Design a protein with these regions (language model features):
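Enzyme catalytic cores with a strong preference for nitrogen-chemistry domains
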Residues: 1-282
Length: 282
């Protein structure tokens, strides 16, 4: 889909799925758009704007331009791996006023180039291999009375950082993950990633919505149970109703502190016990 001849077809397919639904919020996967939004063909942008104008919000995974400020150097424009929220109301130019989430945890070689390895990225012809990095904590999106905290791809591995978002300001009532894991094919990575998302919901007591291009697209309740999902590698839209939650779970309040204290206590006991037992006498 990163090839120019496939970009337009992919965008048309996604817009068709968006127009076929009547959801308050439609979430498209990571890099559903393989070009920045301002380069969307006018006819497709008008179709999307018409749908949003009817009262529907749309979140799109795409690369976005970000002005990166460099100390002592000239500012530079870089791409970020982002989620853009188009929503009803506001400015006439929805894009100009659209909130955005920029991915913070970047994948080596795929999203940033480790020092000294530019030659490898060039050799492998990896598309968009050097993204800018988003802030650690970013404000959730306000949609329909809910506050939705987005993360991208494997960022949902980091429970402590999702916890930090819930503790910041008004927190979030729903979690959302957008992913493009086509790179892993039909491997165990798909169900494993879903299990990771379920754990984040269980830890935080928040439902999670997952939009992926190959699987697993799913809705997870606040108890970590999958309430609906699409079959992997099928074209379609998952239509679900999700109610956000509030309040703080023990994990959200304390994080990994209890398990760290238990680990330290167990290690201390393991070191002390042999000394206390001492040599046995016949």
């Amino acid at each position: 889909k990163f090839r120019p001849e496939r970009t337009l077809a992919a965008m048309q397919s996604y817009i068709g799925l968006v127009e076929s639904g009547d959801a308050a919020l439609t979430i498209l996967p990571e890099t559903a758009w393989t070009i920045p939004f301002e380069r969307t063909p006018p006819a497709l942008a008008q179709r999307l704007d018409a749908h949003v104008g009817k009262g529907h919000a749309v979140a799109i995974g795409l690369p976005a331009f970000t002005l990166e400020q460099k100390r002592g150097l000239r500012d530079d424009w870089r791409l970020t791996n982002s989620v853009l929220l188009l929503q009803p109301g506001g400015a006439a130019d929805r894009y100009a006023s659209a909130p955005r989430y920029d991915k913070h945890h970047l994948v080596p070689f795929g999203e940033f180039i480790p020092w000294g390895f530019a030659w490898f990225v060039n050799l492998m012809q990896i598309p968009m291999g050097d993204f800018g990095r988003g802030a650690t904590i970013q404000a959730p999106f306000a949609v329909g009375g809910q506050r939705i905290a987005f993360n991208i791809c494997y960022e949902d591995l980091f429970g402590e950082e999702i916890r930090a978002v819930l503790l910041e300001g008004s927190g979030a009532s729903i979690l959302a993950n957008v992913s493009n894991i086509a790179w892993f094919g039909r491997s165990h990575a798909l169900p494993q990633h879903l299990q990771i998302a379920r754990m984040r919901s269980l830890e935080t007591g928040r439902p999670m919505l997952r939009a992926t291009n190959t699987g697993m697209t799913a809705a997870i309740d606040a108890g970590g149970k999958v309430i609906a999902q699409l079959e992997p590698y099928t074209v379609g839209a998952l239509d679900v109703s999700v109610q956000g939650t509030s309040g703080l779970t023990p994990f959200t309040r304390l994080g990994n502190l209890p398990i760290l204290l238990l680990a330290i206590a167990a290690l201390a006991l393991a070191l002390i016990a042999p000394r206390r037992s001492g040599p046995s006498s016949a």
